[in-house]
């Protein structure tokens, strides 16, 4: 009989980095909250908690199907061991199904078609499930699956402010949700979704005191930034996705029409309105930008008070990039470790963000790298 190899534990940031790059195979796919397929945001993932940090880990992607990492079925205490062959690398737990998913609006729309739980305590919604970019093959972002969940009947095309307020109130009261992410497909018009978001966040704030991040492309008129803030938005995300013009034109030809320079002008206008660290941008590592290019742009962002939320690219089934390789854990480590140092040195820490993707941190190991760099204390709590 061969001896069982002793456990070899990875640090939390190492384990999260490995699993998010390679995905996992599940012995019991029914464990925890049902995983998402399609839609905006983290899709084809499953929420798992590692060392107190809830993260999104790919389970339905091509790399995940061949992943060397296996998550065992939960034991009697709800813990599952993560193995690579005979080696135990760590443990995960699965957040439970939220209670607000059992409710419907008066007109019969399930709450889960209006907003969903991300991570452990974050409510997320795509206010407008259609997008001018997605509807054109020559303009679509090749990584995006915003239309998939709509086509499958898992969501509705337009969420009203009243619906969003109703669901947000229930999610806070029943499941202890602590903040909300509100994104949108880009509609026709120069406000690029800011108007819909302002109306929507006002609908939520009328029903419940819940911090909300809004996410859109930079509007042509930066006055919309103040209007969203005045409507109740606590934080703002304007997502570059990729940092170099060449990669942006190749991967997201429609969205690339709004240049990197325009994004930086919008960032500089937004930071005085929302505050340092309350403006963020999502950067997908692994689309073609180099480590140095991502870190160089991140430095520019940090210097003006914008939080660069760098996540590993995860290919989503049914998109043009479904077979695109994921970045290696080594590639992500080469970005996340120095980036975490930049953020901690600048006082831009995820723990201080009021709402949104950077605060949630589930799609990247970045916040755990911050903690390793000594960035676990909250500046806001000390003030």
Language model: regions and residue ranges:
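Short, flexible helix-coil linker/hinge segments at the edges of structured domains or between repeats
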Residues: 138-140, 161, 205
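Glycine-rich anion/phosphate-binding loops
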Residues: 155-166
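N-terminal [4Fe-4S]-dependent radical SAM core
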Residues: 54-142, 147-156, 354-373, 382
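Generic detector of short, locally flexible boundary/turn motifs and exposed helical patches
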Residues: 42-49, 88-91, 107, 144-148, ...
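Conserved AdoMet/S-adenosylmethionine-binding subsite of the radical SAM
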Residues: 165, 169-174, 179, 183-324, ...
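Auxiliary Fe-S-binding modules of radical SAM enzymes
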Residues: 1-84, 273, 295-383
């Amino acid at each position: 009989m061969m001896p069982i190899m002793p456990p070899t534990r990875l640090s939390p940031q190492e384990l999260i980095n490995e699993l998010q790059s390679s995905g996992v195979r599940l012995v019991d796919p029914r464990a925890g909250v049902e995983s998402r397929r399609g839609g905006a945001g983290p899709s084809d993932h499953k929420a798992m908690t590692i060392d107190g940090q809830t993260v999104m880990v790919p389970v339905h992607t091509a790399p995940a199907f061949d992943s060397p990492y296996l998550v065992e079925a939960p034991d009697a205490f709800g813990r599952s061991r993560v193995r690579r062959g005979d080696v135990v690398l760590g443990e995960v737990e699965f957040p439970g199904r939220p209670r607000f998913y059992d409710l419907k609006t008066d007109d019969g729309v399930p709450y889960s078609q209006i907003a969903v739980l991300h991570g452990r305590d974050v409510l997320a919604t795509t206010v407008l499930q259609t997008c001018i970019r997605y509807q054109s093959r020559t303009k679509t972002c090749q990584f995006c699956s915003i239309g998939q969940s709509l086509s499958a009947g898992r969501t509705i095309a337009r969420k009203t402010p009243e619906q969003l307020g109703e669901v947000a109130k229930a999610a806070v009261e029943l499941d202890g949700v602590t903040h909300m992410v509100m994104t949108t497909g880009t509609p026709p018009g120069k406000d690029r979704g800011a108007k819909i978001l302002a109306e929507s966040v006002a609908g939520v704030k009328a029903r419940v005191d819940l911090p909300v991040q809004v996410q859109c492309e930079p509007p042509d008129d930066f006055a919309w930034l103040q209007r969203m803030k005045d409507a109740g938005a606590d934080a703002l995300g304007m997502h570059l996705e990729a940092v170099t013009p060449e990669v942006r034109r190749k991967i997201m030809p429609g969205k690339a029409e709004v240049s990197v320079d325009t994004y930086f002008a919008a960032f500089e206008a937004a930071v005085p309105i929302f505050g340092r660290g309350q403006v963020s941008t999502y950067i997908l590592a692994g689309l073609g930008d180099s480590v140095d290019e991502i870190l160089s742009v991140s430095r520019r962002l940090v210097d003006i008070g914008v939080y660069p939320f760098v996540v590993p690219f995860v290919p989503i089934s049914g998109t043009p990039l479904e077979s695109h390789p994921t970045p290696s854990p080594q590639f992500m480590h080469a970005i996340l470790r120095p980036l975490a140092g930049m953020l901690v040195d600048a006082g831009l820490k995820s723990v201080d963000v009021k709402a949104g993707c950077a605060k949630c941190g589930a799609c990247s190991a970045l916040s755990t790298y911050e903690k390793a760099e000594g960035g676990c204390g909250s500046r806001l709590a000390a003030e």
